[in-house]
Amino acid sequence: MGFWGRNSFEADKKHILVTGGSQGLGKAIAKELVLRGANVTIVARTVTKLQEAVAELSDSKIHEDQQVSFESVDLTSYESVHSMIERLPFCPDHVVHCAGSCIPGFFTELDPSVFEKQMRQNYLASVYVCHAAIRRMKEISPSYSRRILLVGSLLSSLPIIGYSAYSPVKAAVRNLADSLRQECILYDIEVSVYLPSTILSPGYEQENTLKPELVLQMEGMDSVQTCEEAASHCMTGLDRGDFLIANESTGHLMKNHCRNSSPHDNPILEYLFALVSLLAWPFYRRKLDSLVYQYALEKGYRQPSSSRNSWIFTLLLTFTQLTIFYLSLNCLIENPYRMLRNTFPIWFIMQTLQIYIQSPRPPLTPKRLLAGAASMLIGSLLISFILVAFGAPLLHDFHLTYFCALTLSVFTVYPLASTLAFNTEQWQRFLTLKSFNVIGSMQLRSWGPIIGAWFGAFPIPLDWDRPWQAWPITIVIGAFLGYAFAAIVGEILQ
């Protein structure tokens, strides 16, 4: 009944039906119930597994007259489920529906029959068990609280790639629990739903043989629990009278992120979880999306694409950099080396922000940042040699030449290296001006400083004898003007 009217979960001497109780989480929950003195009937399809499970569970009995039995039933057949529950010598006090299966795979690579099978094994089996059980349970009104527990999945609140046949039906199971919770008030029956995350079970091991490499990679970030640990968390939630039960921190965050109209079990704590998930989820989602995008590029599923929603940020950042450069202009004329040295960290930080916002996914990571920074340093040396080849000082004022090259590199090599990495095909497209559809205005922003610096070199040899003609002032000014012009034109074209 949730926070305002929760009932305790009584198991001792009660008759409890556990579907999916022959192995995995179902058997672990059944064992917890047996240890509490319950009379447990486990339900599954394979008789040999049921017999082995009953023998194992019987060793945990705490009462001499305690009963542990099994029923072999096809839960995807309503006639079989209804017949089984009707012929039980007792009316179930509690029902734990843990049966189900998961068939992972990419949506387009799964046969349509898989979706039908998942619907039958996960959702319709839940409907059949609940329907037959409630019809019998409503005929009596005991003095103690009764409970129906549906085992769903965290994937009902956090669906990810590879589970398009599984996540939707588990979401349907959760919604079924929401509907039954209110309707079962008519019969004084409590309803709860358990949303566990990854559990080490026989089913999980079988799933791993079917999962695409990407799904295994994404799940490598998750915490994993044994069936016994997950069963213990489930029992704790039942003891508290919770409606939505989770077994780890991500589950608590996501169940509150997607709570909808479900009752609150602990409002203060759950509002806090909801706030944290509201703030954290966009970053976590972007991380997951980035893994998918990178996988798509590596496997050739698609071509890179540029971000289309960063034009305001790009123009704002360009204006900010241009303003800082304008305010530093006198310093550039008076002491070019000091200005270039002191402003370099500013350009580096701003370009890092620009890369993160606009570069094709995946977003900036420490590894990509280091690769881009290393390429920037190497690029600055190459640009220095190019400048020297065109007449820049080699021995005298080489420090000016190098910091001019480093400034050019942070606006050209750094964003490109962080975005294109070591993809030679994309570098060829950039050099041949064919990658605008890939990196958008970044292509123009990279060419802009180069062209601007080239034009900026024109006034240096002229006999005007002006302070701003000193090396490499006009080249730096031209590079910044070229960058600003290219950024504006690039965003307009994009």
UniProtKB/Swiss-Prot annotation:
Residues that bind NADPH, according to the entry? Answer: G20, S22, G24, R45, K49, D74, L75
Asked if the Swiss-Prot or TrEMBL record annotates the protein with the keyword NADP, the reply is yes
Q: Which UniProt keywords apply?
A: Endoplasmic reticulum, GPI-anchor biosynthesis, Lipid metabolism, Membrane, NADP, Nucleotide-binding, Oxidoreductase, Sphingolipid metabolism, Transmembrane, Transmembrane helix
Sorted alphabetically, the Gene Ontology BP terms of this entry are: 3-keto-sphinganine metabolic process; GPI anchor biosynthetic process; sphingolipid biosynthetic process
Binding annotation for NADP(+) = L25, V54, Y166, K170, I199
What residue intervals hold the motif GXSXG? Answer: 20-24
Family annotation (InterPro entries): GPI_biosynthesis_protein_Pig-F (IPR009580), KDSR-like (IPR045022), NAD(P)-bd_dom_sf (IPR036291), SDR_fam (IPR002347)
Q: Main localisation, per the record?
A: endoplasmic reticulum
Against SUPFAM superfamilies, the record matches this protein to: NAD(P)-binding Rossmann-fold domains (SSF51735)
Molecular function terms from GO:
3-dehydrosphinganine reductase activity; NADPH binding
Q: GO cellular component annotations, sorted alphabetically?
A: endoplasmic reticulum membrane
Q: Which domain of life is it from?
A: Eukaryota
Entry's Pfam families?
A: adh_short, PIG-F
Q: In the UniProt entry, which residues are flagged as the active site?
A: Y166, K170
User: Which pathway is recorded for this entry?
Assistant: Glycolipid biosynthesis; glycosylphosphatidylinositol-anchor biosynthesis; Lipid metabolism; sphingolipid metabolism
Asked if the keyword Nucleotide-binding belongs to this entry, the reply reads yes
Catalytic activity entry: sphinganine + NADP(+) = 3-oxosphinganine + NADPH + H(+)
According to the UniProt entry, what is the EC number of this protein?
1.1.1.102
Q: Where in the cell is it found?
A: Endoplasmic reticulum membrane
Query: Topology relative to the membrane, per the entry?
Result: Multi-pass membrane protein
Residues crossing the lipid bilayer are 148-168, 264-284, 312-332, 370-390, 402-422, 444-464, 473-493
Q: Known PANTHER family for this protein?
A: 3-KETODIHYDROSPHINGOSINE REDUCTASE
What is the role of the protein in this entry? Acts in the GPI biosynthetic pathway between GlcNAc-PI synthesis and GPI transfer to protein. Required for the formation of complete GPI precursors CP1 and CP2.
Could you say which protein family the record assigns here?
In the N-terminal section; belongs to the short-chain dehydrogenases/reductases (SDR) family.
**What protein name is recorded for this chain?**
PIGF/3-ketodihydrosphingosine reductase fusion protein
